[in-house]
C-alpha cells in the first residue's frame, strides 16, 4: 500500500511539472487562530487571515472564519462545520465578496512521537452574482489531506508535513483534480495556551489552463482555551 501511494504521488508530481507554460508566483500569509472548549466534546474555532501574492506586492485575500466541532472515538475523530467570509482580489482586477461553508471529518492516530491525520472536507464557495461573471455558483470542492506531525519528547517544538488534493465536483467543463497543496511547518509553544507557527506552502495547479505554481511563507499565532 505504501509503495502504491508513493508511485501515485510520483506520477502526479511528474504530471504537474510536465505541463507547459507554467508560471511562478510568491506571496506571504499572516493569520491568527483561536480554539475554545464548550465543555464535553464540543468546541469553537475562529480564524483571521491576510494573504499577499504577486511577489508580495498585492493584497490578495482577507478571510474571516468561525467554526464548531464535535470530537468522538476518544478524540480520534473530529467532525467540524465552518463558515467563512472572504474578500478576495479576482482575475478582473477588483475585490469581491465570497462566502464559504465547509463540512469536514478528521481522523487521528498516534505512534510514539508521531501523529497521523487524515482529513476529508466538502467545501462550497458562494460568489457575489451582481456582476454575472460566474458560470458555476456555488463552486463545490472535495478536499483530502494527509498530515504527519512529529514532536520530540519534552520539547516546545513541533514539526509537520502535509499534502492535500483539491477536487472540483460541480463544473462540467473544468471538473476534476485541479490543485495540489504541500505545507511544511514548524511550531514553537510560547506559553501554555499560545503557539507561533512558521510555514512554507506550495500550491500547484493541476491540469488547468495557464497553470501557476504558488509559493507562500507564513506566520500564524495560535491560541487554545
Map each language-model feature to its residues.
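Outer-membrane beta-barrel "beta-signal"
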Residues: 105, 213-225
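Repeated loop/turn-to-beta-strand initiation elements of outer-membrane beta-barrel proteins
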Residues: 41-46, 75-79, 112-116, 154-158, ...
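Residue-level signature of outer-membrane beta-barrel architecture
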Residues: 36, 70-72, 107-109, 150-152, ...
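Residues that define the transmembrane beta-barrel architecture of outer-membrane proteins
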Residues: 24-28, 60-64, 97-101, 136-142, ...
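Hydrophobic h-region of N-terminal signal peptides that target proteins for export
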Residues: 9-17
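Start-of-domain marker
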Residues: 19-78
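Transmembrane beta-strands of outer-membrane beta-barrel pores
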Residues: 48-54, 72, 83-89, 109-111, ...
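Membrane-embedded beta-strand positions of outer-membrane beta-barrel proteins
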Residues: 46-48, 79-83, 105, 118-120, ...
Amino acid at each position: 500500500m505504501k509503495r502504491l501511494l508513493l508511485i501515485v504521488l510520483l506520477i502526479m508530481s511528474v504530471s504537474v511539472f510536465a505541463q507547459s507554460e507554467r508560471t511562478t508566483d510568491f506571496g506571504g500569509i499572516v493569520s491568527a487562530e483561536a480554539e475554545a472548549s464548550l465543555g464535553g466534546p464540543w468546541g469553537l474555532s475562529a480564524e483571521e487571515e491576510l494573504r499577499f501574492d504577486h511577489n508580495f506586492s498585492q493584497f490578495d485575500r482577507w478571510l474571516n472564519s468561525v467554526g464548531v466541532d464535535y470530537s468522538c472515538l476518544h478524540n480520534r475523530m473530529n467532525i467540524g462545520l465552518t463558515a467563512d467570509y472572504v474578500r478576495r482580489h479576482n482575475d478582473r482586477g477588483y475585490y469581491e465578496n465570497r462566502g464559504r461553508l465547509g463540512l469536514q471529518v478528521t481522523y487521528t492516530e498516534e505512534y510514539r512521537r508521531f501523529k497521523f491525520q487524515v482529513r476529508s472536507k466538502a467545501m462550497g464557495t458562494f460568489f457575489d452574482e451582481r456582476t454575472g461573471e460566474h458560470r458555476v455558483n456555488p463552486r463545490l470542492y472535495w478536499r483530502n489531506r494527509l498530515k504527519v506531525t512529529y514532536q520530540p519528547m519534552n520539547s516546545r517544538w513541533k514539526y509537520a508535513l502535509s499534502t492535500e488534493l483539491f477536487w472540483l465536483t460541480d463544473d462540467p467543463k473544468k471538473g476534476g483534480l485541479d490543485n495540489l497543496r504541500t505545507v511544511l511547518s514548524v511550531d514553537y509553544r510560547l506559553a501554555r495556551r499560545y503557539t507561533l507557527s512558521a510555514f512554507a506552502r506550495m500550491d500547484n495547479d493541476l491540469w488547468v489552463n495557464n497553470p501557476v505554481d504558488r509559493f507562500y511563507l507564513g506566520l500564524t499565532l495560535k491560541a487554545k482555551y
